[in-house]
């Protein structure tokens, strides 16, 4: 059973919070499916080329079929002609959506959290609020914790804390409702408010 370190105000270990045993029994394939779906949803789908039916011109046969010694041609807009259509090019009418049901999303999150806990890369703190809203205070907190980059998870995200972390390129701050398996997996450490972690454990 994996345990999460609960830190005090001095960022010293005060206690531990156990994750449910079922978090360790999740098939890792659920995480793969969720990450694949999440990344697919980020695709802009803007690349577009014109096919034979879309390119302008080329309706008239450029020369007669036989008798002039050259290769036959039916249109000046085939893909082998300069200015012609593109064969098998990207189109912007593709749908990259990949469905992942709620249970799989939940299982993926549980697996990701359990992996972080096993590697001692998830920390619980009573409060992550930075009332000053200053980036230097947020940077100092991360430096004292000794992590390269971190996902900051608050129970309720306030504007001052968001302002403090916004300019740090090695941190990303969210509230509990935005937490997902991809974000947990992509950051090297997760720092979460104790109340938020308890709500996750309760649901699990």
Swiss-Prot record:
* Keyword set, alphabetical order: Ribonucleoprotein, Ribosomal protein, RNA-binding, rRNA-binding
One short Pfam name that applies is Ribosomal_L4
Is RNA-binding among the key words of this record?
Answer: yes
Write one Gene Ontology MF term.
Answer: rRNA binding
Q: Which SUPFAM superfamilies match?
A: Ribosomal protein L4 (SSF52166)
Cellular component terms per the entry's GO annotation: ribonucleoprotein complex; ribosome
Spell out the residue ranges making up region: Disordered: 49-75
Task: Report the record's Gene Ontology biological process terms.
Answer: translation
From the record, what ranges are coiled-coil?
none
Return the InterPro entries for the record.
Ribosomal_uL4 (IPR002136), Ribosomal_uL4-like (IPR013005), Ribosomal_uL4_dom_sf (IPR023574)
Oligomer and partners: Part of the 50S ribosomal subunit.
This molecule's function is given as: One of the primary rRNA binding proteins, this protein initially binds near the 5'-end of the 23S rRNA. It is important during the early stages of 50S assembly. It makes multiple contacts with different domains of the 23S rRNA in the assembled 50S subunit and ribosome. Forms part of the polypeptide exit tunnel.
* Family statement: Belongs to the universal ribosomal protein uL4 family.
Q: What is this protein called?
A: Large ribosomal subunit protein uL4
Q: What is the species of this protein?
A: Campylobacter hominis (strain ATCC BAA-381 / DSM 21671 / CCUG 45161 / LMG 19568 / NCTC 13146 / CH001A)
Q: What is the lineage of its organism?
A: Bacteria, Pseudomonadati, Campylobacterota, Epsilonproteobacteria, Campylobacterales
